[in-house]
Regions:
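Catalytic donor/gating beta->alpha subdomain of glycosyltransferases that bind UDP-sugars
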Residues: 30-33, 37-64, 92-95, 100-162, ...
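Membrane-embedded multi-pass helical conduit in multi-pass membrane proteins
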Residues: 163-165, 169-244
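Short aromatic/basic micro-patch
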Residues: 17, 88, 107
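Acidic donor-binding/catalytic loop of UDP-sugar-dependent glycosyltransferases
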Residues: 14-29
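Thr-Gly-centered strand-to-loop micro-motif
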Residues: 12-13, 40
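Short aromatic/hydrophobic "clamp" motif used to bind/position activated sugar donors
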Residues: 9
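Long helical/loop segments within the catalytic core of UDP-sugar-dependent glycosyltransferases
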Residues: 1-5, 25-96, 101, 152, ...
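Structural motif
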Residues: 242, 249-250
Length: 255
């Protein structure tokens, strides 16, 4: 970045493919909304069944629980959010936030870089980049698992968030399926009816995000199992961090 001669900079992962009009669209949005750091979620290409299950969970977890209006009207660090695959910033904002040097110990720049900007009193935003870029993050089942684990501690797999998020995710997306099965086995009509409502409401965010971000219906159908697996991986990451163990990612481990 130090050698760049322009005032607007783009940080993009090597596996992200941009559409011809992507940069102009992002720059126009950034200028129109006076955003210091703009992030976009590229279209996530998923081929394997585990990719279809787990990759779209980032839309459900991040955007499903993020109050977007409040995030856009505030610079509080608590509302920091982004996608590390694609960032657009301006030189002065990047310098004021401390550059990537401020987050050099982190592998979750999608969260940490927006937080650094907000700590400096700057505005950040995250938008849907489905029509602007595409990316396939993982190419194997093992890669998906490692990818989820590597960012987990800086996301929700920490002492402050793991319990409430486990209750929210399991209670909203897994428990209604369990109670539906039990109500069918016990022939309890009203419990079954209430459970069906719970299942629909629990799957609705996944369905809406699948439509918005053009994700597979396969992930929607198996959303309860995907959520259960996702939460289990968060707890694995939580225990691993407590034991001082790190996850290797593309030849690197945490320091």
């Amino acid at each position: 970045a130090e050698t760049a001669s322009t005032d607007r900079w783009l940080f993009v992962d090597a596996d992200v493919r941009l559409q011809p009009d992507a940069l102009r669209a992002l720059a126009d949005y950034q200028d129109a909304n006076h955003v210091d750091l703009l992030s976009a979620f590229p279209h996530q290409q998923t081929d394997t069944w585990l990719e279809k299950w787990l990759v779209p969970m980032m839309h459900v977890v991040l955007l499903g629980y993020l109050p977007l209006r409040r995030m856009r009207s505030s610079t509080l660090e608590a509302y920091a959010a982004g996608c590390g695959q694609l960032f657009m910033t301006k030189r002065e904002g990047y310098k004021a936030a401390g550059t990537h040097e401020a987050i050099k110990s982190s592998r979750h720049d999608g969260l940490k870089l927006p937080r650094a900007y907000r700590k400096a009193g700057l505005r950040t935003d995250v938008v849907d980049g489905t029509n602007l870029a595409s990316c396939r993050m993982y190419e194997s089942t093992a890669g998906v698992i490692r990818g989820v684990l590597k960012n987990a501690h800086e996301g929700i797999a920490n002492a402050r968030l793991i319990l409430p998020f486990s209750v929210l995710l399991l209670g909203g997306s897994v428990l209604p399926v369990v109670t539906l099965v039990v109500s069918v086995l016990t022939e309890n009509f009203w419990a079954g009816l209430a459970s069906i409502v719970g299942v629909v409401l629990g799957h609705l965010p996944r369905m809406l995000s699948a439509i918005q971000f053009r994700q597979s219906i396969f992930g929607v159908v198996f959303h309860s199992l995907a959520t259960l697996l996702f939460v289990m991986l968060q707890w694995v990451a939580f225990v691993m961090h407590a034991m001082g163990r790190s996850v290797a990612w593309r030849g690197r481990t945490e320091t």
